[in-house]
Amino acid sequence: MHLATAHLMTTRTPIQKLFSRAGTKARIALGWLSFATRLRPKTEFGDRTPPPAPDYSDRSQWAVHPEAPNKSDFKPLGRDARDRPTACGADVFFIHPTSYFGARYWNAPLDHAHANELVDELIIPGQASVFNDGCRIVAPRYRQATFYSFLRGTKSGRAALELAYTDVLDAFEHYLRHWNQGRPFFIGSHSQGTVHAMRLLKERIDGTDLAERTVAAYAIGFRFPQDQFENGYFKSFHPSRSAIDTRCIVAWDTYSDEGGPSHWIDRAEVWYANSNGTGTWVRRAHKRPVATNPLSWTNDTRAVAASANKGAVHVVLSDPRGVRWKGFGGENPIGLRAHSLSAPHVGEVSATLREDGFLYVSWPITKAFTTAIMPGGNFHNYDYGLFYMNMRENVRQRLDVYLQQQAR
């Protein structure tokens, strides 16, 4: 899931902050309950024909195509704004999060105007752009499962996610055939994109020569289970241990230091592949996730001060007041248009990994990072943005180390 943030700043006293947080939590809980109850599709998955499958030879089927203009080239305000390098050292195959919240379909059509608007104007500039220093970015559109698929572990929701994965796999195969040409690559993902990234890493990449070309996977925002790195499940990948680790999984799930996951209400599921080519959906609640602290790139539990945060970054909209927010989650565009990225907000939050495997942050200074918080103080929509500059630098670090290793 990914919601918009506008370029807003505020100065508040400690008392105002306290009451603002209490009010925010109440509004989040009530608003979330109202929002979620409206999302269930009116029919079951098998009762209607899915939207047409993508043709990945068509540029329009890509949110980011190597030969088409897009907003993955955005750089933070005040940073080097030169054009993307022509000689990129690696690629990133980026799988976007959920942007379809409707109840009309279990899987969004590829030409769904509002879902694509959210991807093109918020997700690509706000998330995929973190990789544009030295990486060529490709990002497919796919028949994503509607957001409701994660709210209940239903047969229809699982079927919708499996259909979405077939598109992601097809897009990856197209990328390999037409663009990769033996180059190293990253996997980048968030939320639903990470659900599919987990499966792609296990079923298509792990144990093959592709694993040797995988610099790292930034599989953020869907509780990548720690137990998938036990008993030989993954042959080629391990959880990241340092800033320069390669062929590894980098993951975190962000909460306010006053919040935390609500396992009792969480019905989202994770795919576990079986050795016979099949798999099983397993509820993720109470599973310890893989965890990396993006302010230190370690997986220990020491607190890391906000001074280590090199800059949180958010999308700046061309006309925030012109956005028709009442239409969010509907069928039509609501007037979103990304103008630029903000300047880095240095020292925005501190971060601490706790024993439960989740990342806990101090309350953000900038209002733009508090307008779309989810229940439990979940900063899911800011998993990338709060650590943007640290991520941007780290992608370059890992790539440089990988290329040095290959040159030996």
Where are these regions (language model features)?
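Active-site catalytic motif of lipid deacylating hydrolases and related acyltransferases
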Residues: 33-58, 94-184, 347, 354-408
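Structural recognition of the beta-strand scaffold that forms the well-ordered cores
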Residues: 91-95, 138-141, 186-187, 216-219, ...
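Active-site-proximal beta-strand/loop segments in catalytic clefts of secreted hydrolases
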Residues: 95-98, 141-145, 190-191, 220-223, ...
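Surface cap/lid and interfacial helix-loop subdomains adjacent to catalytic sites
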Residues: 164-182, 202-369, 376-378, 382, ...
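Gly/Ala-rich beta-loop-alpha elbow adjacent to hydrolase catalytic centers
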Residues: 189-193, 197
